[in-house]
């Protein structure tokens, strides 16, 4: 609640200041005919929308409890808010870029630069205040690596296993380690796991009530109040970074307004109503009447210098480049999280190799690693083992492998080799039905016969034991026999002869 309260207060304060200043810029831009300030007011409007999105995302992200329709809660609301903010800012950059190109084609002269300067300084002060409020979110990325960035507590942590509500075993992290080592995550639901095994009672000091405990329900991590603030802060970094980038863009816009107003005020010599001059920076002179051009009462002069008029669009293009450079990482990161790609710090090939090197593991398939939000990385895998007796020890080793890669929420689906089966022949013991085989699971494709083969192939139901025996015999055949023929099961229909009856 502390982190949410601070973020909410900062967002509300910045929202009020931004909205008030946006109204002020719209009024001043109309009075001074300053298109630069009008574009900056539109930037402020986008910031108002961004702050509203951030507030809504922060509000929804507090609802971490699982529901029947949303088993992970609303933990990804802030990631979605970060993506929306990045898209708003990117669209704004292209709008400013188009306006800057138009300014190069048709330069505009600023009216009342002192008023524009005053409003620009006030806007800069407002944005400096916003940068002070959100500067902690300026450079903190998500999932930057493993180590002390998991949001889990130090000290003694209780062992336990999550109560399985579906097929598979939810593996937690290893027991608590020393403070100088990696932090751990425990998945505690009750005192027994899905196999009815009691929790370790040998070290009762690990179950102290003052120790930080993490509880995972339906894949949603729920922490005690000691660690909730730190984890929520990390989970909302993308959203708050989006707000920071908007405030930074406003600050750059205010700097551009101030610099442009100062340069224009001290360097531009424009034409006034009582002055006789021409403006070579425009296609037509600013005083185009014949009386002024033919007048000999005062010498003619030129307005300028013209480079002052091109300073504003040049600075706008520089601002667009800076904003795009700072927004692209946020846009890319939030989009990749929502696309459930493998986090960049996870080497999936090395992870698969380590899992296959574990003693007792025959095959690893259907491995999926993705990032929920912040530092919460989730993995699921099908692990084929030799026998059920050694599975628990294998699961603990697999859990340690995942933990070493920074993955603390893992779901393992165990598979045990059938009698006489080989891993190379049957890579998946729990293959899907033919309806879903092409979509997910082990990707097994049913054999499809075409042409005359389809007519000759009879539909026969055989047991799994018979199928394994046939496959074993098939694998033992030598290469001298040529191509391996398909297993043909012939069914001969012997007609039942009726016994002849004699009278």
Curated annotation (Swiss-Prot):
Q: Which ranges are annotated Basic and acidic residues under compositional bias? A: 200-211
**Assembly description:** Homodimer. Interacts with TMEM163. Interacts and forms a complex with TMC6 and TMC8; the interaction regulates zinc transport into the ER.
Binding-site positions, Zn(2+): 43, 47, 246, 250
Q: Name one GO molecular function term.
A: zinc:proton antiporter activity
Phosphoserine: residues bearing it: 502
Q: What is this protein called?
A: Proton-coupled zinc antiporter SLC30A1
Which keywords belong to this entry?
A: Antiport, Cell membrane, Cytoplasm, Cytoplasmic vesicle, Endoplasmic reticulum, Glycoprotein, Golgi apparatus, Ion transport, Membrane, Metal-binding, Nucleus, Phosphoprotein, Repeat, Transmembrane, Transmembrane helix, Transport, Zinc, Zinc transport
Q: What outcome is recorded for mutants in which this gene has been deleted?
A: Knockout of Slc30a1 is embryonic lethal.
Q: List the gene name.
A: Slc30a1
Q: Which InterPro entries match?
A: Cation_efflux, Cation_efflux_CTD_sf, Cation_efflux_TMD_sf
Question: Which source organism does the UniProt entry give?
Answer: Mus musculus
